[in-house]
Amino acid sequence: MPDDLINSFMTGPDENGRFGDFGGRFVSETLMPLILELERQYEFAKTDQAFWDEMHHLWTHYVGRPSPLYFAERLTERLGGAKVYLKRDELNHTGAHKINNVLGQIILARRMGKTRIIAETGAGQHGVATATVCAKFGLKCVVYMGAHDVERQAPNVFRMKLLGAEVVPVTSGRGTLKDAMNDALRDWVTNVRETFYCIGTVAGPHPYPAMVRDFQAIIGQEAREQMMEAEGRLPDTLIAAIGGGSNAMGLFYPFLDDKEVAIIGVEAGGKGVNEKMEHCASLTGGRPGVLHGNRTYLLQDDDGQILEGFSISAGLDYPGIGPEHAWLHDIGRAKYVSITDAEALDAFQLCCETEGIIPALEPSHALAHVAKIAPDLPRDHIICMNMCGRGDKDIFTVAKALGQDMSGAV
Protein backbone atom coordinates (compact mmCIF):
# COMPACT_ATOMS: atom_id res chain seq x y z
CA MET A 1 0.00 0.00 0.00
CA PRO A 2 1.43 3.42 -0.92
CA ASP A 3 2.88 5.38 2.01
CA ASP A 4 1.54 8.72 0.78
CA LEU A 5 -2.16 7.91 1.13
CA ILE A 6 -4.39 10.35 2.95
CA ASN A 7 -4.56 9.85 6.70
CA SER A 8 -8.08 8.44 6.58
CA PHE A 9 -9.75 6.03 4.18
CA MET A 10 -13.17 7.32 5.30
CA THR A 11 -13.17 10.79 3.73
CA GLY A 12 -14.56 9.88 0.29
CA PRO A 13 -16.16 10.62 -1.98
CA ASP A 14 -14.93 14.05 -3.08
CA GLU A 15 -17.25 16.88 -4.16
CA ASN A 16 -17.66 15.24 -7.58
CA GLY A 17 -18.67 11.91 -6.10
CA ARG A 18 -15.32 10.31 -6.87
CA PHE A 19 -13.38 7.67 -4.98
CA GLY A 20 -10.04 8.15 -6.69
CA ASP A 21 -10.64 7.24 -10.34
CA PHE A 22 -14.04 5.69 -9.63
CA GLY A 23 -17.60 6.83 -9.05
CA GLY A 24 -18.92 10.13 -10.39
CA ARG A 25 -22.22 11.09 -12.05
CA PHE A 26 -22.62 9.76 -15.60
CA VAL A 27 -26.31 10.44 -16.22
CA SER A 28 -28.53 12.07 -18.83
CA GLU A 29 -29.39 15.76 -18.75
CA THR A 30 -32.92 14.80 -17.72
CA LEU A 31 -31.69 13.05 -14.60
CA MET A 32 -29.00 15.50 -13.54
CA PRO A 33 -31.37 17.95 -11.77
CA LEU A 34 -32.88 15.03 -9.83
CA ILE A 35 -29.46 13.74 -8.83
CA LEU A 36 -28.31 17.18 -7.68
CA GLU A 37 -31.52 17.74 -5.69
CA LEU A 38 -31.14 14.31 -4.07
CA GLU A 39 -27.58 15.21 -3.08
CA ARG A 40 -28.73 18.51 -1.56
CA GLN A 41 -31.50 16.81 0.40
CA TYR A 42 -29.20 14.07 1.67
CA GLU A 43 -26.45 16.49 2.69
CA PHE A 44 -29.05 18.37 4.75
CA ALA A 45 -30.54 15.20 6.26
CA LYS A 46 -27.08 13.92 7.28
CA THR A 47 -26.68 16.86 9.64
CA ASP A 48 -30.28 16.79 10.93
CA GLN A 49 -30.52 14.97 14.26
CA ALA A 50 -34.27 14.45 13.76
CA PHE A 51 -33.52 12.39 10.64
CA TRP A 52 -31.16 10.07 12.51
CA ASP A 53 -33.48 9.89 15.52
CA GLU A 54 -36.22 8.55 13.24
CA MET A 55 -33.76 6.14 11.63
CA HIS A 56 -32.55 4.73 14.93
CA HIS A 57 -36.10 4.45 16.28
CA LEU A 58 -37.16 2.38 13.26
CA TRP A 59 -33.94 0.35 13.21
CA THR A 60 -34.64 -0.60 16.82
CA HIS A 61 -38.41 -1.04 16.90
CA TYR A 62 -39.19 -2.05 13.30
CA VAL A 63 -36.06 -3.78 11.97
CA GLY A 64 -34.94 -5.32 15.27
CA ARG A 65 -31.43 -3.87 15.50
CA PRO A 66 -28.86 -4.33 16.78
CA SER A 67 -28.43 -7.69 15.09
CA PRO A 68 -26.45 -10.18 17.20
CA LEU A 69 -22.75 -10.92 16.83
CA TYR A 70 -22.70 -14.71 17.15
CA PHE A 71 -19.72 -16.94 17.93
CA ALA A 72 -20.13 -19.91 15.57
CA GLU A 73 -18.68 -22.45 17.98
CA ARG A 74 -19.40 -25.69 16.11
CA LEU A 75 -18.32 -24.20 12.78
CA THR A 76 -15.11 -23.02 14.43
CA GLU A 77 -14.53 -26.53 15.83
CA ARG A 78 -15.21 -28.14 12.45
CA LEU A 79 -12.78 -25.84 10.64
CA GLY A 80 -10.16 -26.22 13.35
CA GLY A 81 -8.48 -22.84 13.22
CA ALA A 82 -9.57 -19.23 13.63
CA LYS A 83 -12.54 -18.21 15.77
CA VAL A 84 -15.49 -17.41 13.52
CA TYR A 85 -18.08 -14.79 14.44
CA LEU A 86 -21.18 -14.14 12.34
CA LYS A 87 -22.83 -10.72 12.23
CA ARG A 88 -26.44 -11.91 12.09
CA ASP A 89 -28.09 -9.42 9.72
CA GLU A 90 -30.25 -12.20 8.34
CA LEU A 91 -32.28 -11.81 11.55
CA ASN A 92 -33.44 -8.34 10.52
CA HIS A 93 -37.10 -7.81 9.60
CA THR A 94 -37.44 -9.05 5.97
CA GLY A 95 -34.45 -11.39 6.37
CA ALA A 96 -31.47 -9.42 5.11
CA HIS A 97 -29.40 -6.26 5.43
CA LYS A 98 -31.32 -4.47 2.68
CA ILE A 99 -33.87 -2.83 4.97
CA ASN A 100 -31.13 -0.84 6.75
CA ASN A 101 -30.70 1.25 3.61
CA VAL A 102 -34.31 1.23 2.40
CA LEU A 103 -35.53 2.92 5.57
CA GLY A 104 -33.08 5.77 5.10
CA GLN A 105 -33.92 6.35 1.46
CA ILE A 106 -37.69 6.22 1.97
CA ILE A 107 -37.55 8.59 4.95
CA LEU A 108 -35.61 10.90 2.62
CA ALA A 109 -38.17 10.39 -0.17
CA ARG A 110 -41.00 11.38 2.16
CA ARG A 111 -39.11 14.52 3.14
CA MET A 112 -38.85 15.33 -0.57
CA GLY A 113 -42.59 14.88 -1.08
CA LYS A 114 -42.30 11.79 -3.29
CA THR A 115 -45.31 9.45 -3.44
CA ARG A 116 -44.06 6.68 -5.73
CA ILE A 117 -41.02 4.51 -5.01
CA ILE A 118 -39.27 2.40 -7.63
CA ALA A 119 -36.53 -0.14 -7.03
CA GLU A 120 -34.49 -2.80 -8.77
CA THR A 121 -33.91 -6.21 -7.23
CA GLY A 122 -31.93 -9.36 -7.97
CA ALA A 123 -32.41 -11.89 -5.18
CA GLY A 124 -35.62 -10.09 -4.26
CA GLN A 125 -34.46 -9.00 -0.80
CA HIS A 126 -34.14 -5.32 -1.74
CA GLY A 127 -37.50 -5.53 -3.45
CA VAL A 128 -39.10 -7.10 -0.38
CA ALA A 129 -37.53 -4.50 1.91
CA THR A 130 -38.71 -1.66 -0.35
CA ALA A 131 -42.24 -3.08 -0.59
CA THR A 132 -42.28 -3.53 3.19
CA VAL A 133 -41.33 0.05 4.02
CA CYS A 134 -43.65 1.42 1.32
CA ALA A 135 -46.51 -0.53 2.90
CA LYS A 136 -45.63 0.90 6.30
CA PHE A 137 -45.75 4.46 4.99
CA GLY A 138 -48.56 4.04 2.44
CA LEU A 139 -46.46 4.71 -0.67
CA LYS A 140 -46.90 3.24 -4.14
CA CYS A 141 -44.16 0.72 -4.91
CA VAL A 142 -42.93 -0.62 -8.27
CA VAL A 143 -40.11 -3.18 -8.32
CA TYR A 144 -38.17 -4.07 -11.47
CA MET A 145 -36.82 -7.61 -11.47
CA GLY A 146 -35.11 -9.59 -14.22
CA ALA A 147 -37.37 -12.29 -15.66
CA HIS A 148 -34.74 -14.94 -14.91
CA ASP A 149 -34.61 -13.79 -11.28
CA VAL A 150 -38.43 -13.77 -11.06
CA GLU A 151 -38.30 -17.46 -11.90
CA ARG A 152 -35.53 -18.45 -9.47
CA GLN A 153 -36.71 -16.20 -6.61
CA ALA A 154 -40.46 -16.98 -6.73
CA PRO A 155 -40.98 -16.84 -2.92
CA ASN A 156 -39.74 -13.25 -2.79
CA VAL A 157 -41.88 -12.26 -5.79
CA PHE A 158 -44.96 -13.49 -3.93
CA ARG A 159 -43.87 -11.65 -0.78
CA MET A 160 -43.54 -8.38 -2.71
CA LYS A 161 -47.01 -8.80 -4.19
CA LEU A 162 -48.47 -9.60 -0.76
CA LEU A 163 -46.97 -6.33 0.46
CA GLY A 164 -48.75 -4.41 -2.28
CA ALA A 165 -45.91 -3.87 -4.74
CA GLU A 166 -46.17 -4.11 -8.50
CA VAL A 167 -43.43 -6.46 -9.73
CA VAL A 168 -42.33 -5.77 -13.31
CA PRO A 169 -40.43 -8.68 -14.96
CA VAL A 170 -37.62 -7.39 -17.19
CA THR A 171 -37.04 -9.52 -20.29
CA SER A 172 -34.20 -7.57 -21.89
CA GLY A 173 -30.65 -8.92 -21.79
CA ARG A 174 -30.37 -12.06 -19.67
CA GLY A 175 -33.17 -10.91 -17.37
CA THR A 176 -31.02 -10.29 -14.28
CA LEU A 177 -30.10 -7.44 -11.94
CA LYS A 178 -28.28 -5.30 -14.52
CA ASP A 179 -31.31 -5.32 -16.78
CA ALA A 180 -33.67 -4.51 -13.90
CA MET A 181 -31.53 -1.49 -13.01
CA ASN A 182 -31.61 -0.32 -16.64
CA ASP A 183 -35.40 -0.35 -16.71
CA ALA A 184 -35.69 1.32 -13.31
CA LEU A 185 -33.51 4.19 -14.55
CA ARG A 186 -35.74 4.54 -17.64
CA ASP A 187 -38.81 4.71 -15.39
CA TRP A 188 -37.19 7.41 -13.26
CA VAL A 189 -36.47 9.58 -16.30
CA THR A 190 -40.09 9.22 -17.43
CA ASN A 191 -41.72 9.91 -14.05
CA VAL A 192 -39.43 12.49 -12.52
CA ARG A 193 -41.93 14.56 -10.54
CA GLU A 194 -43.47 12.06 -8.10
CA THR A 195 -40.97 9.19 -8.23
CA PHE A 196 -37.99 8.35 -6.01
CA TYR A 197 -35.54 5.67 -7.14
CA CYS A 198 -34.46 3.56 -4.15
CA ILE A 199 -31.20 1.90 -5.26
CA GLY A 200 -30.30 -1.21 -3.32
CA THR A 201 -26.53 -1.22 -3.50
CA VAL A 202 -23.45 1.02 -3.31
CA ALA A 203 -23.50 1.64 -7.06
CA GLY A 204 -25.18 4.15 -9.33
CA PRO A 205 -24.50 7.87 -9.75
CA HIS A 206 -23.35 10.01 -6.82
CA PRO A 207 -24.72 10.38 -4.12
CA TYR A 208 -26.07 6.80 -4.11
CA PRO A 209 -22.82 4.90 -3.36
CA ALA A 210 -22.03 7.09 -0.34
CA MET A 211 -25.64 7.35 0.82
CA VAL A 212 -26.25 3.59 0.76
CA ARG A 213 -22.89 3.03 2.49
CA ASP A 214 -23.81 5.47 5.25
CA PHE A 215 -27.13 3.72 5.89
CA GLN A 216 -25.49 0.27 5.89
CA ALA A 217 -22.59 1.35 8.12
CA ILE A 218 -24.77 0.53 11.13
CA ILE A 219 -23.62 -3.08 10.54
CA GLY A 220 -19.95 -2.31 11.12
CA GLN A 221 -20.64 0.20 13.89
CA GLU A 222 -22.51 -2.45 15.85
CA ALA A 223 -19.92 -5.12 15.07
CA ARG A 224 -17.12 -2.94 16.49
CA GLU A 225 -18.92 -2.45 19.78
CA GLN A 226 -20.04 -6.07 20.00
CA MET A 227 -16.58 -7.44 19.23
CA MET A 228 -15.00 -5.24 21.88
CA GLU A 229 -17.55 -6.53 24.37
CA ALA A 230 -17.07 -10.18 23.35
CA GLU A 231 -13.29 -10.30 22.88
CA GLY A 232 -11.93 -7.02 24.23
CA ARG A 233 -10.37 -6.20 20.86
CA LEU A 234 -11.17 -5.76 17.18
CA PRO A 235 -11.32 -8.73 14.79
CA ASP A 236 -8.26 -9.67 12.77
CA THR A 237 -10.21 -10.24 9.55
CA LEU A 238 -13.52 -9.04 8.10
CA ILE A 239 -15.18 -11.08 5.34
CA ALA A 240 -18.32 -10.32 3.34
CA ALA A 241 -19.88 -11.32 0.02
CA ILE A 242 -19.99 -8.77 -2.79
CA GLY A 243 -22.38 -8.22 -5.67
CA GLY A 244 -22.76 -4.47 -5.88
CA GLY A 245 -21.28 -4.48 -2.39
CA SER A 246 -23.64 -2.81 0.11
CA ASN A 247 -23.51 -5.41 2.90
CA ALA A 248 -19.73 -5.56 2.60
CA MET A 249 -19.35 -1.78 2.58
CA GLY A 250 -21.61 -1.59 5.62
CA LEU A 251 -19.34 -3.96 7.54
CA PHE A 252 -16.03 -2.65 6.19
CA TYR A 253 -16.48 1.12 6.36
CA PRO A 254 -16.22 1.67 10.14
CA PHE A 255 -12.99 -0.41 10.16
CA LEU A 256 -11.20 1.19 7.18
CA ASP A 257 -8.81 3.20 9.35
CA ASP A 258 -7.96 0.21 11.57
CA LYS A 259 -4.88 -0.88 9.63
CA GLU A 260 -4.50 -4.03 11.73
CA VAL A 261 -7.88 -5.34 10.49
CA ALA A 262 -7.64 -7.25 7.21
CA ILE A 263 -10.61 -6.77 4.87
CA ILE A 264 -11.69 -9.40 2.33
CA GLY A 265 -14.56 -9.11 -0.16
CA VAL A 266 -15.82 -12.28 -1.82
CA GLU A 267 -17.14 -12.10 -5.39
CA ALA A 268 -19.26 -14.65 -7.25
CA GLY A 269 -16.95 -16.94 -9.21
CA GLY A 270 -19.80 -18.81 -10.91
CA LYS A 271 -18.38 -21.68 -12.93
CA GLY A 272 -14.88 -20.26 -12.48
CA VAL A 273 -13.17 -16.99 -13.46
CA ASN A 274 -12.52 -17.73 -17.13
CA GLU A 275 -12.48 -16.12 -20.56
CA LYS A 276 -16.10 -17.20 -21.13
CA MET A 277 -17.10 -14.79 -18.33
CA GLU A 278 -19.10 -17.52 -16.57
CA HIS A 279 -18.83 -15.55 -13.34
CA CYS A 280 -19.64 -12.18 -11.77
CA ALA A 281 -16.20 -11.39 -10.36
CA SER A 282 -15.73 -7.92 -11.84
CA LEU A 283 -12.68 -7.04 -9.71
CA THR A 284 -11.04 -10.41 -10.29
CA GLY A 285 -11.85 -10.68 -13.98
CA GLY A 286 -13.01 -7.25 -15.19
CA ARG A 287 -11.63 -3.81 -16.01
CA PRO A 288 -12.73 -0.19 -15.47
CA GLY A 289 -15.67 1.24 -17.42
CA VAL A 290 -18.95 3.11 -16.94
CA LEU A 291 -22.31 1.53 -16.07
CA HIS A 292 -25.41 2.80 -14.30
CA GLY A 293 -24.03 6.28 -13.74
CA ASN A 294 -20.65 5.46 -12.20
CA ARG A 295 -17.16 4.42 -13.23
CA THR A 296 -16.04 1.14 -11.73
CA TYR A 297 -14.74 -2.33 -12.59
CA LEU A 298 -17.03 -4.14 -15.04
CA LEU A 299 -17.24 -7.35 -17.01
CA GLN A 300 -16.88 -6.15 -20.61
CA ASP A 301 -15.57 -7.19 -24.00
CA ASP A 302 -12.75 -5.59 -26.00
CA ASP A 303 -15.21 -3.03 -27.41
CA GLY A 304 -16.45 -1.97 -23.97
CA GLN A 305 -19.79 -3.76 -24.27
CA ILE A 306 -21.08 -5.01 -20.92
CA LEU A 307 -21.12 -8.79 -20.71
CA GLU A 308 -23.68 -10.98 -19.00
CA GLY A 309 -22.14 -12.57 -15.93
CA PHE A 310 -23.19 -15.80 -14.28
CA SER A 311 -23.83 -16.87 -10.69
CA ILE A 312 -26.11 -19.28 -8.88
CA SER A 313 -26.77 -16.36 -6.52
CA ALA A 314 -29.27 -13.84 -7.91
CA GLY A 315 -28.05 -11.18 -5.49
CA LEU A 316 -24.45 -11.42 -6.73
CA ASP A 317 -25.37 -11.75 -10.42
CA TYR A 318 -24.23 -8.25 -11.42
CA PRO A 319 -21.41 -7.40 -13.89
CA GLY A 320 -20.03 -4.50 -11.82
CA ILE A 321 -19.18 -3.44 -8.29
CA GLY A 322 -19.58 -0.33 -6.16
CA PRO A 323 -16.96 2.37 -6.92
CA GLU A 324 -15.68 2.55 -3.35
CA HIS A 325 -14.82 -1.14 -3.53
CA ALA A 326 -13.00 -0.51 -6.82
CA TRP A 327 -10.97 2.22 -5.09
CA LEU A 328 -10.22 0.08 -2.02
CA HIS A 329 -9.07 -2.67 -4.37
CA ASP A 330 -6.73 -0.42 -6.33
CA ILE A 331 -5.11 1.21 -3.28
CA GLY A 332 -4.69 -2.17 -1.59
CA ARG A 333 -6.74 -1.50 1.56
CA ALA A 334 -9.04 -4.43 0.83
CA LYS A 335 -8.46 -7.77 -0.85
CA TYR A 336 -11.01 -9.31 -3.20
CA VAL A 337 -11.31 -13.00 -4.04
CA SER A 338 -13.82 -15.19 -5.85
CA ILE A 339 -15.75 -18.30 -4.84
CA THR A 340 -17.42 -20.70 -7.29
CA ASP A 341 -21.02 -21.87 -7.21
CA ALA A 342 -19.89 -25.32 -6.10
CA GLU A 343 -17.87 -23.91 -3.19
CA ALA A 344 -20.80 -21.73 -2.11
CA LEU A 345 -23.16 -24.73 -2.16
CA ASP A 346 -20.75 -26.70 0.04
CA ALA A 347 -20.59 -23.79 2.50
CA PHE A 348 -24.39 -23.47 2.46
CA GLN A 349 -24.69 -27.09 3.62
CA LEU A 350 -21.84 -26.73 6.13
CA CYS A 351 -23.57 -23.82 7.85
CA CYS A 352 -26.88 -25.68 8.01
CA GLU A 353 -25.26 -28.78 9.49
CA THR A 354 -22.96 -27.12 12.03
CA GLU A 355 -24.91 -24.07 13.21
CA GLY A 356 -28.57 -24.68 12.40
CA ILE A 357 -28.56 -21.53 10.26
CA ILE A 358 -29.80 -21.65 6.66
CA PRO A 359 -27.79 -18.91 4.93
CA ALA A 360 -28.69 -17.16 1.71
CA LEU A 361 -26.53 -18.09 -1.27
CA GLU A 362 -24.96 -14.63 -1.13
CA PRO A 363 -23.29 -14.97 2.32
CA SER A 364 -22.60 -18.63 1.50
CA HIS A 365 -19.89 -17.28 -0.81
CA ALA A 366 -18.32 -15.40 2.10
CA LEU A 367 -18.66 -18.47 4.30
CA ALA A 368 -16.89 -20.57 1.68
CA HIS A 369 -13.88 -18.28 1.88
CA VAL A 370 -14.00 -18.46 5.68
CA ALA A 371 -13.91 -22.25 5.38
CA LYS A 372 -10.98 -21.98 2.98
CA ILE A 373 -8.72 -19.81 5.17
CA ALA A 374 -9.76 -20.48 8.78
CA PRO A 375 -8.07 -23.92 9.14
CA ASP A 376 -4.65 -22.39 8.40
CA LEU A 377 -5.00 -19.51 10.86
CA PRO A 378 -4.05 -19.64 14.57
CA ARG A 379 -6.78 -20.30 17.12
CA ASP A 380 -6.53 -16.79 18.53
CA HIS A 381 -7.21 -15.24 15.10
CA ILE A 382 -10.71 -13.71 14.97
CA ILE A 383 -12.79 -13.64 11.79
CA CYS A 384 -15.98 -11.57 11.61
CA MET A 385 -18.22 -12.48 8.66
CA ASN A 386 -21.44 -10.74 7.68
CA MET A 387 -24.35 -13.17 7.44
CA CYS A 388 -26.26 -10.72 5.27
CA GLY A 389 -29.31 -12.81 4.40
CA ARG A 390 -31.27 -15.93 5.25
CA GLY A 391 -31.72 -18.78 2.81
CA ASP A 392 -35.47 -19.38 2.74
CA LYS A 393 -35.59 -17.77 -0.70
CA ASP A 394 -32.91 -20.10 -2.06
CA ILE A 395 -34.12 -23.55 -1.04
CA PHE A 396 -35.57 -24.35 -4.48
CA THR A 397 -32.40 -23.21 -6.26
CA VAL A 398 -30.22 -25.23 -3.89
CA ALA A 399 -32.45 -28.30 -4.16
CA LYS A 400 -32.24 -28.16 -7.95
CA ALA A 401 -28.45 -27.74 -7.86
CA LEU A 402 -28.11 -30.70 -5.49
CA GLY A 403 -30.52 -32.86 -7.49
CA GLN A 404 -33.09 -33.00 -4.69
CA ASP A 405 -36.79 -33.56 -5.40
CA MET A 406 -38.97 -30.80 -3.89
CA SER A 407 -42.29 -32.37 -4.94
CA GLY A 408 -43.12 -33.33 -1.36
CA ALA A 409 -42.01 -36.95 -1.36
CA VAL A 410 -39.80 -37.94 1.57
Curated annotation (Swiss-Prot):
Tetramer of two alpha and two beta chains. Pathway: Amino-acid biosynthesis; L-tryptophan biosynthesis; L-tryptophan from chorismate: step 5/5. Gene3D superfamilies: 3.40.50.1100. It holds the Pfam family PALP. InterPro entries: Trp_synth_b_CS, Trp_synth_beta, Trp_synth_beta/beta-like, TrpB-like_PALP, TrpB-like_PALP_sf. Belongs to the TrpB family. It comes from Dinoroseobacter shibae (strain DSM 16493 / NCIMB 14021 / DFL 12). GO terms for cellular component: cytoplasm. Coiled coil: none annotated. The modification N6-(pyridoxal phosphate)lysine is found at K98. It comes from the Bacteria. GO terms for molecular function: tryptophan synthase activity. This is Tryptophan synthase beta chain. The keyword Amino-acid biosynthesis applies. Its EC number is 4.2.1.20. The beta subunit is responsible for the synthesis of L-tryptophan from indole and L-serine. It catalyses: (1S,2R)-1-C-(indol-3-yl)glycerol 3-phosphate + L-serine = D-glyceraldehyde 3-phosphate + L-tryptophan + H2O. Keywords: Amino-acid biosynthesis, Aromatic amino acid biosynthesis, Lyase, Pyridoxal phosphate, Tryptophan biosynthesis. Its cofactor is pyridoxal 5'-phosphate. The keyword Amino-acid biosynthesis applies. The lineage of its organism: Bacteria, Pseudomonadati, Pseudomonadota, Alphaproteobacteria, Rhodobacterales.
